[in-house]
A protein has these predicted regions:
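A domain-start/cap signature at the N-terminus of enzymes
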Residues: 25-66, 330
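Gly/Ser-rich "nucleophile elbow"/oxyanion-hole loop immediately N-terminal to the catalytic nucleophile
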Residues: 59, 114-153
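Short beta-strand element of the alpha/beta-hydrolase
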Residues: 63-75
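Active-site machinery of serine-nucleophile hydrolases
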Residues: 75-126
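The feature captures the conserved acid-bearing segment of alpha/beta-hydrolase catalytic domains
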Residues: 183-238, 242-245
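C-terminal catalytic histidine-bearing segment of alpha/beta-hydrolase fold enzymes
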Residues: 213, 223-226, 233-301, 378, ...
Length: 396
């Protein structure tokens, strides 16, 4: 009887597990819905249909705007969608939620203007990107202004051409295994004459290569071009060169994307250390730096809060007045941030100013109402602790 009950329990658990897996599978399949966007243009002889892969929050966070990633290869869609979902689902860290656009399939009319550009016969491809493709995506979807171009082999080489010939199209380029040797665009010559003259604005260019049999014929040209780009890069242009030697050829775009995404959004996620050149200049310099990142590099707000908190923490013991002033500036800059008020409350508490600690922590609790339950619970517990300490202190 005991054995039967055990078997029955195992069977029930198994059924529940299968049901759970089924529900999870259904949820997962709906996380990144794909829509179609048809774009007609006088520059292309037939309409081009694109797959638009939307991030998980797109339909629910209707006031949110998103990064754009474009890749010319239709089969890159599952790769980008899967990597993006995995790398963004844990708090958009390291990959900020992104709209991914790829052609639905091969299109002869688009291929024609692509070939004309590669062969140096016309600039229709540049005009198509500037006049039709990117404006239509922006018209139909909520973009925040930051645009990434991704390409592999020939498409990577074309991406370098786009950067040099029309640098305002994209903010970042992920160029994996670019076919640079004897390329009709003569990219090494373009780099030598055009790269240093690009407009002085922030941009990111990742170029990667391997020693695979498919890449070997392009290694010498790759080394030449990347050396030129590293030397000639305009101010605020970050050139990132990677060699993924020993890895398979078809793994290159996966590796390139992983590395590049971390670098592209590093300034969003990583706070300035207190001993950095900018932080040493103080809170105002930190705020100015993040204003530059927001307005010039990304086109959306990048918070300075964690950098301000780090600087204040480093000064709290030996320069408490300076530390509190920094944290007060943080709450002035981010008055709706529970994290800003919590940091100031913690500073007051450490300095045994319990009354002010309670007042600030109450604001932290108030502004935490829209945060996940963990933060609501944690901040309420801190408020109780601060209040109890204040009461005990008053009773002494």
């Amino acid at each position: 009887m005991v054995k039967f009950a055990s078997y029955l329990m195992l069977a029930m658990l198994g059924t529940i597990s299968l049901l759970s897996l089924s529900v999870c599978a259904t949820d997962i399949s709906a996380l990144n819905p794909i829509e179609e966007l048809t774009i007609s243009s006088e520059l292309v002889d037939a309409p081009v249909i694109y797959n638009v892969t939307l991030p998980a929050s797109y339909q629910t966070k209707t006031d949110k705007r998103y990064v754009l990633l474009f890749d010319i290869h239709p089969r890159s869609q599952p790769m980008h969608a899967g990597m993006h979902d995995w790398m963004s689902h844990n708090g958009a860290w390291p990959w900020l939620e992104t709209i991914i656009v790829t052609p639905k399939n091969y299109n002869e009319a688009f291929a024609a203007i692509y070939a004309e550009y590669v062969e140096g016969k016309s600039t229709k491809l540049l005009e198509y990107f500037a006049q039709d493709l990117l404006p239509n995506i922006a018209k139909n979807y909520r973009l925040n202004g930051f645009k990434i171009y991704s390409g592999f082999t020939g498409n990577a080489a074309v991406g370098l051409g786009l950067l040099l010939d029309q640098p305002d199209l994209f903010n970042a380029y992920i160029l994996a295994s670019p076919t640079l040797n004897n390329h009709p665009l003569k990219l090494h010559e373009k780099v030598a004459t055009q790269f240093s003259k690009l407009p002085n604005k922030p941009r990111y260019v990742a170029l990667s290569m391997s020693d695979s049999s498919y890449d070997k014929s392009h290694l010498a040209a790759f080394e030449q071009v990347t050396a030129q780009m590293t030397l000639l890069a305009p101010e605020h242009t970050q050139v990132s060169v990677q060699r993924f030697d020993g890895n398979y050829y078809m793994t290159q775009p996966v590796l390139a994307t992983s590395y590049a995404i971390e670098e592209i959004f590093n300034d969003v996620h990583q706070a300035l250390t207190p001993d950095s050149a900018i932080a040493k200049q103080g809170a105002d310099a930190i705020l100015a730096h993040y204003q530059f990142l927001s307005a010039e590099k990304y086109g959306f707000e990048v918070s300075a809060l964690n950098s301000l908190k780090a600087l204040a923490k480093s000064k709290l013991e030996n320069e408490p007045e300076t530390a509190i002033a920094i944290l007060q500036k943080a709450t002035q800059q981010y008055p709706e941030s529970a994290f800003a008020h919590e940091a100031l409350a913690a500073g007051y508490f450490q300095l045994k100013d319990y009354k002010k600690a309670v007042a600030e922590q109450k604001l932290a609790v108030e502004h935490a109402k829209d945060l996940v339950p963990y933060w609501q619970r944690t901040y309420q517990e801190k408020l109780s602790k601060y209040q109890q300490t204040l009461n005990n202190h008053a009773a002494e």
